[in-house]
């Protein structure tokens, strides 16, 4: 019975050879952890905004900043290993290609960089900017997840599924976004 299923699935029966690498075990889980940490930073920033009795800067300093530091480190490692994978295994001609998925993963990372820099140099900008910037990494992490999972909506070198012959899926970007 199992052989019948694999015969019917054709190209889907085996993992793409480009994905059969040790970096596949490391890179995607690191980015998933990175996105999760970005969402945690956003939740702490929202708690700081919505908490009437506590100082927002104190909440950010005690809760969001340590998570942002870990998220920055994990994101740097995840994005860096993705670049190494692209250069060595995938032979895409470089570490970075400005692919929609790569760019989407860079956005929450840049937000964390800005957030941490504003935390290091307090007083240069009003504190509300730091709090507002703390909200952005989670939103961009959700956006990056959507871009990564929306295979076919944005042309991407990260599209490892599909054989290009499926006629039942709409080619309209709006319809594909609604399918998400």
Where are these regions (language model features)?
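Catalytic cores of phosphodiester-bond-cleaving enzymes
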Residues: 33, 46, 50, 74-77
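Core mixed alpha/beta domains of very large multi-subunit molecular machines
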Residues: 21, 29, 35-37, 41, ...
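Internal, non-catalytic "lid/hinge" segments that mediate substrate recognition, gating
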Residues: 8-11
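Alpha-helical transmembrane segments of multi-pass membrane proteins
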Residues: 78, 144-145
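Short aromatic-rich membrane-water interface segments that cap or initiate transmembrane helices
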Residues: 13-33, 93-107, 158-179
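Juxtamembrane membrane-water interface segments of multi-pass membrane proteins
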Residues: 41-69, 81-97, 112-137, 147-163
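Hydrophobic alpha-helical transmembrane segments of polytopic
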Residues: 34-37, 67-75, 104-111, 130-141, ...
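Short, small-residue-biased leader/transition segments that mark boundaries at the very start
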Residues: 1-6
């Amino acid at each position: 019975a199992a052989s019948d299923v694999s015969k019917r699935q054709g190209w889907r029966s085996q993992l793409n050879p480009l994905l059969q690498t040790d970096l596949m075990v490391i890179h995607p889980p690191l980015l998933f952890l990175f996105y999760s940490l970005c969402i945690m930073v956003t939740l702490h920033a929202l708690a700081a905004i919505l908490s009437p009795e506590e100082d927002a800067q104190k909440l950010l300093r005690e809760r969001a900043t340590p998570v942002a530091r870990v998220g920055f480190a994990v994101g740097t490692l995840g994005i860096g290993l993705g670049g190494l994978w692209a250069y060595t295994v995938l032979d895409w001609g470089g570490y970075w290609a400005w692919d929609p998925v790569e760019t989407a993963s860079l956005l929450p990372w840049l937000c964390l960089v800005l957030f941490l820099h504003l935390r290091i140099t307090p007083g240069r900008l009003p504190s509300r900017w730091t709090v507002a910037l703390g909200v952005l990494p989670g939103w961009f992490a959700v956006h990056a997840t959507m871009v990564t999972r929306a295979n076919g909506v944005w042309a991407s070198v990260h599209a490892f599924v599909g054989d290009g012959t499926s006629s039942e899926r709409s080619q309209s970007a709006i319809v594909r976004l609604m399918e998400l």
